[in-house]
Amino acid sequence: VQRLYPFQLSGGMARRVLFSTAVITDASLIIADEPTPGMDVKSAVEALQLLRELADAGKGVLLITHDIDLAVEVADTVAVFYEGRTVDMAPAAAFHGDGAELVHPYTKALYHALPQNDFTVYTAAEVTQMTAAGGA
């Protein structure tokens, strides 16, 4: 790996190299943008456990993902973006239970789309209508 250019690495290998770099440096903030695609399941689980350990050790970890289940399982706090803006910020635990702490209609739609919450799927028009009514 040491003699290879980044474009010569597979997606999973490149992510493993980046995780290794994060561990051996003294960075106070680690930004992980979609860290698990391209990794096999075992490597992805290990990478997420590593991020959790780094956060527990006092490092700042910003996990950027489209996988709401992953965010809820790994993060302490989940920020939800809609149309390029942060519309909600809640403890990850708020996505379990009844979702009463969730404020924005888009966040509530995401909550209801989770399999453990009856997997209610809304059309784009319904989400747009809900956010317009709820004040985006």
Regions found by a protein language model. Name each.
Residues T65-H66:
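H-loop/switch region of ABC-family ATPase nucleotide-binding domains
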Residues I30-D33:
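Catalytic Walker B motif of ABC-type/P-loop ATPase nucleotide-binding domains
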Residues A71-E73:
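A short, surface-exposed alpha-helical micro-motif characterized by mixed small hydrophobic
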Residues T25, A57:
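Conserved signature/switch motifs of ABC ATPase nucleotide-binding domains
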